[in-house]
Amino acid sequence: MSVSKKPMVLVILDGYGYREEQQDNAILNAKTPVMDALWAKRPHTLIDASGLEVGLPDRQMGNSEVGHVNLGAGRIVYQDLTRLDVEIKERTFFANPVLTNAVDQAKNAGKAVHIMGLLSAGGVHSHEDHIMAMVELAAERGAEKIYLHAFLDGRDTPPRSAEASLKKFEDKFAALGKGRVASIVGRYYAMDRDNRWDRVEKAYDLMTLAQGEFQADTAVAGLQAAYARDENDEFVKATVIRAEGQADAAMEDGDTLIFMNFRADRAREITRAFVNADFDGFARKKVVNLNFVMLTEYAADIKTAVAYPPASLANTFGEWMAKNDKTQLRISETEKYAHVTFFFNGGVEEPFAGEERILINSPKVATYDLQPEMSSAELTEKLVAAIESGKYDTIICNYPNGDMVGHTGVMEAAIKAVEALDNCIEQVTKAVESVGGQLLITADHGNAEQMRDPATGQEHTAHTNLPVPLIYVGEKNVKAVEGGKLSDIAPTMLSLMGMEIPQEMTGKPLFIVE
């Protein structure tokens, strides 16, 4: 008979953040004798679950998807916006081989470098700072003909806010003594995602043929004319920018075109119009043989160069367990099942070898304040049985209550949710100790600790950017390390299991065995 395993259990209390003020704090207003005792007597620390520490922009609240990806990856997993910000700050962007080759190819052949993208500080589909860096890269590498095709936002930014952005770029080109804004058009045309090809065609013709409904000497003048026609940024009609005596910026064979949007959904259609030989969305008046670069991969079936391919996460916690012939269980309710499986595994849908999964149905209620305990009793029953079974080397469990009930904004319900969790943690702790296992209790982000917005006085239904607790329960004598983050959890678990930490994991163990 096989030896009974002493599992390493990770319990993720979703939306269970740490905040010392009791007011509007469902966690501190709940009766939680079990968690209180664990915090008082067991090794513990606070860890970051938001902002740069999880690969999001500075001070941005965490979320469950990002949280679980970081938990399972054992390294900070940067979102595209932050990844590019970091690359530009550290100047590795300026050495990106795909971008530099594309610029050099055009320069050496006496061809133009065209840059297109959403000129916006919105940071949702693109960021104008990234476009500015691309202009600088092209200029630094000696490109003489640099043409910017500006898509205007007004959707993730105020409806009439493009003027400052356009002026910034016109000033930049003036300072460089080369390059210019060659066209402006609203994102309504250039960034459609619903196969409204008549819109896309207008943006395509504007850039390929240098033909539009309107023409202006400068980008700012073109924008002001659009405002006079009562067009907000998003809806600015195709406008060619060319002063008298300036060369035409129409695209020619051999030119380079770099698309600086990082979000895929609204970048695909216009990219296909440029790249696909068999494109049939509209009859293209001019088909140009371009050296086309996508900033990120917009779709796997678009065959063209990608400056920043998707980061594949090798050796996540789940994969490392499988490689080491360990058994693992993932268990949660419907609401967070994808998080302990797909997201924790770094975006991999298929279970790894030795990975089992248990899904507990979340209750069928309109909103979870009506049943704040959710399915936690059944989840705990199954979790305890799994711990006691001796089958698993490691178990990952998520309790959704703090987050799902926190989102309702109903304080009394959130308190009940937290109290239900305390009862569950008591049973789980006893089960782990009875088999000589180890337990880490943490959260993926905050929520229930802030149930009212202090600024507005309204119910606070969103996540927070506050730290989350991390508690160790087990037989090892350990010392907690300060200053941790979610991506330190996987290395912590491996270290406590006495396993090697793969080199891809840059996180650090937060409990050191003494």
UniProtKB/Swiss-Prot annotation:
Pfam families in the cross-refs: iPGM_N (PF06415), Metalloenzyme (PF01676)
Keyword field: Glycolysis, Isomerase, Manganese, Metal-binding
GO cellular component: cytosol
Positions that bind substrate: H125, R155, D156, R187, R193, R263, A264, D265, R266, K336
Biological process per Gene Ontology, one example term: glucose catabolic process
Residues holding Mn(2+) 1: D403, H407, H463
Residues the record marks as active site: S64
Pathway of action: Carbohydrate degradation; glycolysis; pyruvate from D-glyceraldehyde 3-phosphate: step 3/5
EC number, as in UniProt: 5.4.2.12
Coiled-coil region: none
Subunit annotation: Monomer.
UniProt family annotation: Belongs to the BPG-independent phosphoglycerate mutase family.
Function: Catalyzes the interconversion of 2-phosphoglycerate and 3-phosphoglycerate.
Name assigned to this protein: 2,3-bisphosphoglycerate-independent phosphoglycerate mutase
The species this protein was found in: Salmonella typhi
